From Swiss-Prot:
Origin species: Renibacterium salmoninarum (strain ATCC 33209 / DSM 20767 / JCM 11484 / NBRC 15589 / NCIMB 2235)
Record-linked PANTHER family: TRANSALDOLASE (PTHR10683:SF31)
GO BP term (any one): carbohydrate metabolic process
Keywords: Cytoplasm, Pentose shunt, Schiff base, Transferase
Catalyzed chemical reaction(s): D-sedoheptulose 7-phosphate + D-glyceraldehyde 3-phosphate = D-erythrose 4-phosphate + beta-D-fructose 6-phosphate
Pfam families tied to this protein: TAL_FSA
SUPFAM superfamilies, A to Z: Aldolase (SSF51569)
CDD domains noted in UniProt: Transaldolase_like
Name of the protein this chain belongs to: Transaldolase
GO cellular component, one term: cytoplasm
GO molecular-function terms, A-Z: transaldolase activity
Main location: cytoplasm
EC number(s) reported in the record: 2.2.1.2
Source lineage: Bacteria, Bacillati, Actinomycetota, Actinomycetes, Micrococcales
Length: 374
């Protein structure tokens, strides 16, 4: 039976779920999304884990065991999150095998407090990879300037990487270069390049949220006509960069050696403004060799009424450039916006991580008290 999500998959878009919890793994809800809505991967981030662990009861037994072992909060969070990701990797093992590792992938992010620490990120990436112990795990590394070298070194060690928090075209080019350097290093180190997978997570809706605020402040007809267009335009131009770099001679040499391209991944695809169609960042960003990671609400909307009408990216680059040029013409600085979004994105993840640590610390204390009373 043809469905909206199966049509999206047929158009070249891998559907990943931007959510994970132990309850999803044990209740069958994740399996249902795999079976019915063509989900072929999962992404996580500090905010997702913070929400899952603070709201659910599925973690109480493990927290009690960790408290009995005298685990500190950092070790406890590491064990809880890597266990969830390892279990999710098992859910997707069949898809990973069938797709030769391109899909069936589960992402786990390095501690966001290390986003500005190159060596700390490299060490954490290797530790997470070893702890999860699954071939289909992606280690998420933020695309900070300090993260670029960490991306190269992690890939060079043969570890698959999801580069996250990309907002600008300039940074995206730097990320692709870090990827190419990493694959070249992996080749020199003797790794099987066909086993190294990478995606570059380009954030979409947050661009509109910030730029729309500035357009609203201008309150002109031209400003109003540009609302809700920047995020899609920015992502489409990122795909143009992808097409350009991955048809280059430099890439051809690596592809001959078995390397696989780093696919663009559309992240932050939940629509924030109710005035826009709730599938905007799905149906307007369809092209071969991309991933779209969706919150469940967006996935449900896509399955229900997301009309897939072929490739909606290629050949629309002049239109996309026109949007960004018009914004600059109104005095809205692209570079200022993307720098702010990176800063805010990292701050949100660090805040969520600290909330997660606080919650698990409280749970450990409570479990230890109960243990001493029994």
């Amino acid at each position: 039976m043809t469905t909206n999500t199966s049509e999206l998959s047929a158009a070249g878009v891998s559907i990943w779920l931007d959510d994970l919890s132990r309850e999803r793994l044990t209740s069958g809800s994740l399996q249902k999304l795999i079976d019915e809505k063509n989900v072929v991967g999962v992404t996580t981030n500090p905010s997702i884990f913070q929400a899952a662990i603070s709201k659910g009861t599925s973690y109480e037994q493990q927290v009690s065991e960790l408290a009995a072992q005298g685990a500190d909060v950092e070790a406890a969070v590491f064990q809880i999150t890597t266990q969830d990701v390892a279990n999710a990797c098992d859910f997707f093992a069949g898809i990973a095998v069938a797709s030769k590792g391109v899909d069936g992938r589960v992402s786990i992010e390095v501690d966001p407090r290390k986003a500005w620490d190159t060596q700390g990120t490299i060490e954490e990436a290797k530790r997470l990879h070893a702890a999860v112990g699954k071939d289909n795990v992606h280690i998420k590394i933020p695309a900070t300037l300090e993260g670029l070298e960490a991306i190269t070194e992690t890939l060079g060690a043969g570890i698959s990487v999801n580069v996250t928090l990309i907002f600008s075209l300039g940074r995206y080019r730097a990320v692709i270069n870090a990827f190419l350097l990493g694959i070249e290093k992996a080749k020199a180190n003797g790794h099987d390049l066909s086993q190294i997978h990478s995606v570059a997570s380009f954030f979409v809706s947050r661009v509109d949220t910030e730029i729309d605020k500035r357009l609203d402040a201008l309150n002109t007809d031209e400003a109003k006509s540009l609302k809700g267009k920047a995020g899609v335009a920015n992502a489409r131009l990122a795909y143009q960069v992808f097409e350009e770099v991955f048809s280059s001679e430099r890439w051809a040499l690596l592809a001959e050696a078995g390397a696989l391209p780093q696919r663009p991944l559309w992240a932050s695809t939940g629509v924030k403004d109710p005035a826009y169609p709730d599938t905007l960042y799905v149906t307007e960003l369809v092209a071969p060799n991309v991933v779209n990671t969706m919150p469940e609400k967006t996935l449900d909307a896509t399955a229900d009424h997301g009309v897939v009408s072929g490739n909606t990216i290629s050949g629309r680059y002049d239109e996309a450039n026109g949007v960004l040029n018009a914004l600059e013409g109104l005095g809205i600085s692209y570079n200022e916006v993307v720098a702010l979004l990176e800063k805010e994105g990292l701050e949100k993840f660090v805040a969520s991580w600290k909330e997660l640590l606080d919650h698990v610390q409280d749970a450990l204390n409570s479990a230890a008290t109960k243990g001493s009373e029994s």
